[in-house]
Amino acid sequence: MEGEGVQPLDENLENGSRPRFKWKKTLRLVVSGIKGAGMLLCFIYVCLQLSSSPAKDPPIQRLRGAVTRCEDGQLFISSYKNEYQTMEVQNNSVVIKCDGLYIIYLKGSFFQEVKIDLHFREDHNPISIPMLNDGRRIVFTVVASLAFKDKVYLTVNAPDTLCEHLQINDGELIVVQLTPGYCAPEGSYHSTVNQVPL
């Protein structure tokens, strides 16, 4: 009675579990090979990314300039020379080379009553800047969407005084890019815009 129809334990292991064990071992080898190949591909990708030079974002565009006098109906803007200035002034206009949102800040005091308009695009109406102290003081901030080839400049109208005789105290213009966008390659602005000789 002992052992009728029941195989001994040693025979059961030899007959049934060995093929299953070989299948698991083969499956583990295949999975390990795939993992190893995946790790190798990831390593190669990381090495290629580190070896290639990263795309350099253009610096944030900014300008701080003094508004000192009036010339030909426009306020004269002279930029301070330092390493933080990334924009330039041409013909009393701040040249925009990169698309994006910009904050424009203007302050100053005048000895006469004046009206100032902010211009930045040829086909748009200028922004009439509100004045304080009977048109003699200005503290103005605006956020504008500017694009490549735009020019920021200020026109002034003084009812009782010629432009060249306006007296300006503590005038300052600050233009700072808030959101980076498309930037024209260096030198492209000079070749695409007609310059007016002084």
Swiss-Prot record:
Residues carrying a glycan: 91
Native species: Mus musculus (Mouse)
Record's keyword terms, sorted: Cytokine, Disulfide bond, Glycoprotein, Membrane, Signal-anchor, Transmembrane, Transmembrane helix
Keyword Nucleotide-binding assigned: no
Cystine pairings recorded for this chain: 70-163, 98-183
GO process annotations (BP): acute inflammatory response; blood vessel development; CD4-positive, alpha-beta T cell costimulation; cellular response to lipopolysaccharide; cellular response to nitrogen dioxide; cellular response to prostaglandin E stimulus; cholesterol metabolic process; defense response to nematode
Chain's role: Cytokine that binds to TNFRSF4. Co-stimulates T-cell proliferation and cytokine production.
Protein name: Tumor necrosis factor ligand superfamily member 4
